[in-house]
């Protein structure tokens, strides 16, 4: 029997399940555990290869007949918001974001629960309890933060009402947005878009070149918003390809 080093990741393949993005397709995922002293280093390496993190698991699609899921990362240092994106920034100028330690709160869960009920009531996360939420935030062996967005108080400082939050990993070369959510009662603010814009600005100020947005699927309305943040890179079999306003993918 082969003895594997505890530092050598072991990969597993899930059984096929219905794809949540493309009707009539089946999805499978390859995954491994992120534990131990090398978890952060492994998470960085796997993220560069198109994996995503969920708690102490790193996964990526491994579907038999489909390669539609494409990993996307925004080039933070070159990003310039379009006119419409500048409007989103202006609309949310009264919000203050603070990057905090990954500690769950009842206030966060209240927003999270309302967001799921309004946006994803039939999804795989619909039944998450407060304990499930706490696990999502705390079960991490990598550098994870939660960015809270609150209304600015009369004094101009943070401390007002929480309206959104983003669970975020800090990688060696960027910020990876693990999961973000917002108060559905202020849907007109485009808070999902605003949080991405804020993360791009944060990455730039931290000297990090990229913001990882997860998977983009061409033709999927659920994923189309990710194509708005240009220039970006998309992972292909030949490595990361640059996509700018022309929509043409080129080797960077």
UniProtKB/Swiss-Prot annotation:
Enzyme Commission number(s) from the entry: 2.3.2.29
GO MF annotation terms: arginyl-tRNA--protein transferase activity; leucyl-tRNA--protein transferase activity
Entry GO terms, CC: cytoplasm
Function noted in UniProt: Functions in the N-end rule pathway of protein degradation where it conjugates Leu from its aminoacyl-tRNA to the N-termini of proteins containing an N-terminal aspartate or glutamate.
Pfam families from the UniProt entry: ATE_C, ATE_N
Catalytic activity of the protein: N-terminal L-glutamyl-[protein] + L-leucyl-tRNA(Leu) = N-terminal L-leucyl-L-glutamyl-[protein] + tRNA(Leu) + H(+); N-terminal L-aspartyl-[protein] + L-leucyl-tRNA(Leu) = N-terminal L-leucyl-L-aspartyl-[protein] + tRNA(Leu) + H(+)
Family, as annotated: Belongs to the R-transferase family. Bpt subfamily.
Gene Ontology terms describing biological process: ubiquitin-dependent protein catabolic process via the N-end rule pathway
Subcellular localization: Cytoplasm
PANTHER family: ARGININE-TRNA-PROTEIN TRANSFERASE 1, ARGINYL-TRNA--PROTEIN TRANSFERASE 1
Keywords: Acyltransferase, Cytoplasm, Transferase
Name the UniProt record assigns to this protein: Aspartate/glutamate leucyltransferase
Enzyme class: transferase
InterPro entries assigned to the protein according to its UniProt record, in alphabetical order: Acyl_CoA_acyltransferase, Asp_Glu_LeuTrfase, N-end_Aminoacyl_Trfase, N-end_Aminoacyl_Trfase_C, N-end_Aminoacyl_Trfase_N
Species lineage: Bacteria, Pseudomonadati, Pseudomonadota, Alphaproteobacteria, Hyphomicrobiales
Family matches, as HAMAP family: Bpt
